[in-house]
Amino acid sequence: MKLLAMVALLVTICSLEGALVRRQAAETDVQTLFSQYLQSLTDYGKDLMEKAQPSEIQNQAKAYFQNAQERLTPFVQRTGTNLMDFLSRLMSPEEKPAPAAK
């Protein structure tokens, strides 16, 4: 009976030790995987910076701002004209309409 209890205890301890070793091995794999991920992300960033030349980015930004200016200039002018008309009507003393007859 003691022999059976010792064998069961030995099997339990060995399985727990094996689980602990597997857990520790999994942690190092996660660390390795994370470091490889960061390295690939860094390499991708470097490649992207090499491909996208600063002059290209500046040209794209200039084109965007020119396009925005072309679209917004008429709108701003029209809004300014409407605002001035509104203010001039508000400030000019016009005759009030006669009250409606009862």
UniProtKB/Swiss-Prot annotation:
Family, similarity comment: Belongs to the apolipoprotein A2 family.
Entry GO CC: chylomicron; extracellular space; high-density lipoprotein particle; spherical high-density lipoprotein particle; very-low-density lipoprotein particle
Residue positions where Methionine sulfoxide is found in the record: 49
Entry-linked Pfam families: ApoA-II
InterPro entries: ApoA-II, ApoA-II_sf
Record keyword Transport present: yes
Localization (cell): Secreted
Protein keywords: Cleavage on pair of basic residues, HDL, Lipid transport, Oxidation, Secreted, Signal, Transport
Protein name: Apolipoprotein A-II
Its biological purpose: May stabilize HDL (high density lipoprotein) structure by its association with lipids, and affect the HDL metabolism.
Subunit structure: Monomer. Interacts with NAXE and NDRG1.
Tissue: Plasma.
Residues annotated as signal peptide: 1-18
GO-annotated molecular function: apolipoprotein receptor binding; cholesterol binding; cholesterol transfer activity; enzyme binding; heat shock protein binding; high-density lipoprotein particle binding; high-density lipoprotein particle receptor binding; lipase inhibitor activity
Domain of life: Eukaryota
Record flagged with keyword Secreted: yes
GO BP of this protein: animal organ regeneration; cellular response to lipoprotein particle stimulus; cholesterol efflux; cholesterol homeostasis; cholesterol metabolic process; cholesterol transport; diacylglycerol catabolic process; high-density lipoprotein particle assembly
Principal subcellular localisation of the protein: secreted
